[in-house]
Curated annotation (Swiss-Prot):
PANTHER family: FLAGELLIN. It holds the Pfam family Flagellin_N. Belongs to the bacterial flagellin family. It comes from the Bacteria. The lineage of its organism: Bacteria, Pseudomonadati, Campylobacterota, Epsilonproteobacteria, Campylobacterales. Its main location: secreted. Keywords: Bacterial flagellum, Secreted. GO terms for molecular function: structural molecule activity. The gene is flaA. The keyword S-adenosyl-L-methionine does not apply. Flagellin is the subunit protein which polymerizes to form the filaments of bacterial flagella. FlaA binds to flagellar assembly factor FliW protein, preventing FliW from binding to CsrA, so that CsrA can then bind flaA mRNA and represses its translation. This is Flagellin A. Heteromer of FlaA and FlaB. Interacts with FliW. One of its GO terms (cellular component) is extracellular region.
Length: 572
């Protein structure tokens, strides 16, 4: 071999290898000390880009999980508040049920109504004060609220919480048909009862016979109420228009085909003769008689059969001629507040004919709190007939209009035209029992007084009080009102349950999403770790290798430098 001293190639090779080993050792120490395989872009450019993307996704998913938990907190806050409201509604319904029996006096019912009013105030207080981070939850403003629960924009869950104030819940539909004065066979059909289909009930005969009448029709409707959502009640009552005066029935006097015969009775039926005679056959006729608080004769069919009076009951009973055949009024209730659409055949025998006056109203929980408007009261079925007023006690129509409680006031536009004083035109027993009957007494026109020749539409604006329909006291202070409050409270409970069910569905959706993105976040972090984090086992081996090479490199360099000393031996 040759000996050269100007260029020590062996030393240069040893130094070069030592430099490489030093860099490897530095890199290995950097990875071991940081725990990362990628400490700079130079370590793995493409790997770093992928790892950074995965880290961003994992961090975003972490915030999405936090957002989802916030959503759950909001929904749980609303749910617990509504749970308290449901307890309040349960109490309201219980108190309404307590008031719905005639063992209660007006005083005790008024106390119950006061309790109900306080409960409604608390229900509204909960609705108006329940909030989360300053955001109202139950006031009706929490609509289509979005929560970002994904790594990319617009990956959201929407939540809506309906209003729960007493003015917004409990909306119940009440419809009461006109008084039925003719018998017949009725085919009753509910249109679009579920938004799509019609429901046809079995045919029912409206008559005075056993197993017929509005009672039978109501039973047919109620046995399908779970499917249709419509329930029915009935009122079949014939009431005298004035307190009973002394008189006598005819020998041919009969009710529902059962002969009662001649009965002499006193003022107010003081001797009980008339009531006793009618009730002696009540098991056969289905009609029960009583004297009400105003001294008027009241005939009631509790089975829902018609009440038909044959012969002469006597003028002292003050039963209008048009009420001698009475099949009552049918009331329908629907708990979703929507209109009850009816079709069928011979609907006039059910009180829902095209020409009959049908009272209808949708009533919220709050509306049952105060005085019940006359129109709403009629829709709820307060009136057994379109009750009228007796004009026989007034010298003229104009005198009646001027009287207290007539429903008219000065300047109302209703007056008797010149020369049309009808004081002699009214017999003592003539009453206005319905708009249709009013036209048979005298036609009415608005603005020009009671004039002959007027059409039905001309008296359409007459106040309901003129027909004897009046406002009713608040809520449960009457039996009918208590029944109506029970219906409304039941609707309100259903409304809140529906809102809570919607909230529960969103809660389940959010919970499932959180569970899913939690797993996704773990997997994304695992993928990032595979790329970014160092494998300590492998890197320890690399470190040991680099460390040994560094030591051996130093020894090799020392040996390479000492080789030059061999040249001196040649010069000795």
């Amino acid at each position: 071999m040759g000996f050269r001293i100007n260029t020590n190639v062996a030393a240069l090779n040893a130094k070069a290898n030592a430099d490489l080993n030093s860099k490897s050792l530095d890199a290995s120490l950097s990875r071991l000390s940081s725990g990362l395989r990628i400490n700079s872009a130079a370590d793995d450019a493409s790997g770093m880009a992928i790892a950074d993307s995965l880290r961003s996704q994992a961090n975003t998913l972490g915030q999405a999980i936090s957002n989802g938990n916030d959503a759950l907190g909001i929904l749980q806050t609303a749910d617990k508040a509504m749970d308290e409201q449901l307890k309040i509604l349960d109490t309201i319904k219980t108190k309404a049920t307590q008031a719905a029996q005639d063992g209660q006096s007006l005083k005790t019912r008024t106390m119950l109504q006061a309790d109900i009013n306080r409960l409604m105030e608390e229900l509204d207080n909960i609705a108006n004060t329940t909030s989360f981070n300053g955001k109202q939850l139950l006031s009706g403003n929490f609509i289509n609220q979005e929560f970002q629960i994904g790594a990319s924009s617009n990956q959201t869950v929407k939540a809506t919480i309906g209003a729960t104030q007493s003015s917004k819940i409990g909306l119940t539909r009440f419809e009461t048909g006109g008084r039925i004065s003719t018998s017949g066979e009725v085919q009753f059909t509910l249109k679009n009862y579920n938004g799509i289909d019609d429901f046809q009930f079995q045919k029912v005969v409206i008559s005075t016979s056993v197993g017929t009448g509005l009672g039978a029709l109501a039973d047919e409707i109620n046995k399908n109420a779970d499917k249709t959502g419509v329930r029915a009640t009935f009122t079949v009552e014939t009431r005298g228009i004035a307190a009973v005066r002394a008189g006598a029935t005819s020998d041919t006097f009969a009710i529902n085909g059962v002969k009662i015969g001649k009965v002499d009775y006193k003022d107010g039926d003081a001797n009980g003769a008339l009531v006793a005679a009618i009730n002696s056959v009540k098991d056969t006729t289905g009609v029960e008689a009583s004297i009400d608080a105003n001294g008027q004769l009241l005939l009631t069919s509790r089975e829902g059969r018609g009440i038909k009076i044959d012969g002469n009951i006597g003028g002292g009973a003050f039963i209008n001629a048009d009420m001698k055949e009475n099949y009552g009024r049918l009331s329908l209730v629907k708990n979703d507040g929507k209109d009850i659409l009816i079709s069928g055949s011979n609907l006039s025998s059910a009180g829902f004919g095209a020409t009959q006056f049908i009272s209808q109203a949708s009533v919220s929980l709050r509306e049952s709190k105060g005085q019940i408007d006359a129109n709403i009261a009629d829709a709820m079925g307060f009136g057994s007939a379109n009750k009228g007023v007796v004009l026989g006690g007034y010298s003229s129509v104009s005198a009646y209009m001027s009287s207290a409680g007539s429903g008219f006031s000065s300047g109302s536009g209703y007056s008797v035209g010149s020369g049309k004083n009808y004081s002699t035109g009214f017999a003592n027993a003539i009453a206005i029992s319905a708009a249709s009957q009013l036209s048979t007494v005298y036609n009415v026109s608005a603005g020009s007084g009671f004039s002959s020749g007027s059409t039905l539409s001309q008296f359409a604006t007459m106040k309901t009080t003129a027909f004897g329909v009046k406002d009713e006291t608040a809520g449960v202070t009457t039996l009918k009102g208590a029944m109506a409050v029970m219906d409304i409270a039941e609707t309100a409970i259903t409304n809140l349950d529906q809102i809570r069910a919607d909230i529960g569905s969103v809660q389940n959706q959010v919970t499932s999403t959180i569970n899913n993105i939690t797993v996704t976040q773990v997997n994304v972090k695992a993928a990032e770790s595979q790329i970014r984090d160092v494998d300590f086992a492998a890197e320890s081996a690399n470190y040991s290798k680099a460390n040994i090479l560094a030591q051996s490199g130093s020894y090799a360099m020392a040996q390479a430098n000492s080789v030059q000393q061999n040249v001196l031996r040649l010069l000795q």
